[in-house]
């Protein structure tokens, strides 16, 4: 029989610049906020990193994550790799919700860090306003190691 060698878990402690470098190409995230009763609310989201090193997520102001952040700014984001078994990291920080009209140009920046240039920025801006979008911005103040799952190291 041919058995693969067991994969050993990793946990690499990183600086803030190394953290942001790890996050930038990854856009699959799980955002956790706190409900009014103190329990966790988690949502799968698409996110990026802005020029100031904050995690940015586009959403709608009526969503539970926004309601929760307006009440309690504490948030946690797990950033996943495209490969589910790939490296991931948890980032904690203070979150804020930016509403329209202030959010329009921030949503342009969000799109750029996720997907690059849009073919028609005027159309994109109109769509963001028509859809009533907002932006969540999280400033990292604590993060775990960049980790992978597997067997505990010996």
Segments from the language model and where they lie:
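Short, conserved active-site entrance elements at the starts or edges of catalytic domains
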Residues: 3-36
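Short secondary-structure boundary segments
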Residues: 81-82, 140
């Amino acid at each position: 029989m041919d058995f693969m060698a067991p994969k050993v878990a990793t946990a690499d402690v990183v600086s803030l610049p190394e953290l942001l470098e790890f996050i930038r190409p990854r856009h699959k995230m799980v955002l956790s906020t706190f409900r009014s009763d103190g329990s966790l609310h988690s949502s799968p989201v698409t996110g990026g990193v802005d020029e100031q090193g904050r995690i940015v997520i586009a959403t709608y102001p009526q969503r539970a994550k926004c309601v929760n952040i307006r009440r309690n700014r504490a948030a946690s984001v797990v950033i996943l790799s495209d490969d589910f078994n790939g490296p991931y990291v948890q980032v904690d920080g203070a979150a804020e919700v930016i509403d329209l009209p202030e959010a329009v140009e921030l949503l342009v920046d969000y799109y750029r860090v996720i997907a690059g240039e849009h073919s028609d920025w005027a159309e994109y801006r109109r769509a963001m306003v028509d859809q009533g979008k907002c932006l969540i911005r999280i400033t990292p103040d604590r993060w775990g190691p960049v980790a992978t799952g597997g067997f505990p190291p010996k």
